[in-house]
């Protein structure tokens, strides 16, 4: 059989790591997988993120940028049913809270960034002014209470 580790939302390391629903209650692709295992459901499915790049680099390339640099986040996201997607972005500082396996973590404060353009899942923005480690999060919802999420770590030097 199959079981679900956490049915809900939880801030742990990042706001999108463990929960299978967003903070607003939107279902992620994990819900689709579990529904397929349990029900063989024909529910409207969550969008899918195929790729996320920052300045044409993958998250495995340890992207370092300078303060005030113009950055470009590009994504390849689609919806299985072809629903129109709405895109949201946020930048958070890296989480350094030390907690034990599953203990409560406080949500981090968003970092204000200067957005230059936001078109179809592609964002051009100015890097944060403060040196340190950050993550940029992308959320793509389909207007049907489903969402795809991804994040990209980067360092401002």
Each model region followed by its residue ranges:
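Exoplasmic/lumenal beta-rich domain surfaces
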Residues: 86-126
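Short beta-strand edge segments in extracellular beta-sheet folds
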Residues: 153-157
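Short, conserved beta-strand segments of beta-strand-rich sandwich/propeller modules, principally
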Residues: 72, 133-137
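Short, surface-exposed loop/turn segments at beta-strand-coil junctions that are enriched for proline
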Residues: 126-132, 144
């Amino acid at each position: 059989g199959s079981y679900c580790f956490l049915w809900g939302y939880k801030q742990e390391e990042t706001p999108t790591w463990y929960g299978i629903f967003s903070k607003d209650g939107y279902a992620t692709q994990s819900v689709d997988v579990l529904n397929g295992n349990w029900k063989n459901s024909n529910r409207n499915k969550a969008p899918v993120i195929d790729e996320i790049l920052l300045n044409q680099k993958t998250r495995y390339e340890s992207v370092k940028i300078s303060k005030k640099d113009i950055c470009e986040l590009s994504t390849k996201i689609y919806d299985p049913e072809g629903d129109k997607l709405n895109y949201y972005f946020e930048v958070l500082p890296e989480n350094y809270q030390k907690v034990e396996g599953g203990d409560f973590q406080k949500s981090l404060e968003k970092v204000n960034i200067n957005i230059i353009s936001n078109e179809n899942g592609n964002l051009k923005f100015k890097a944060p002014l403060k040196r340190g480690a950050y993550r940029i999060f992308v959320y793509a919802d389909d207007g049907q209470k489903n969402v795809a999420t991804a994040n990209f770590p980067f360092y401002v030097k």
